[in-house]
Amino acid sequence: MRVQPSVKKICRNCKIIRRHGIVRVICTDPRHKQKQG
């Protein structure tokens, strides 16, 4: 899980979602997981 000021899609499987006001990237590749913080 990477915490970044701005989250971006890395590959075509990445999806940007909002959970409880936190922007996250979920992907089939675990290295692509990101969280905005």
Curated annotation (Swiss-Prot):
UniProt GO MF annotations: structural constituent of ribosome
Segments traversing the membrane: none
Keywords of the record: Ribonucleoprotein, Ribosomal protein
Gene Ontology CC terms: cytoplasm; ribonucleoprotein complex; ribosome
Pfam families: Ribosomal_L36 (PF00444)
UniProt keyword Ribosomal protein, yes or no: yes
GO biological process: translation
PANTHER family linked: 50S RIBOSOMAL PROTEIN L36, CHLOROPLASTIC (PTHR42888), LARGE RIBOSOMAL SUBUNIT PROTEIN BL36C (PTHR42888:SF1)
Family: Belongs to the bacterial ribosomal protein bL36 family.
Protein name: Large ribosomal subunit protein bL36
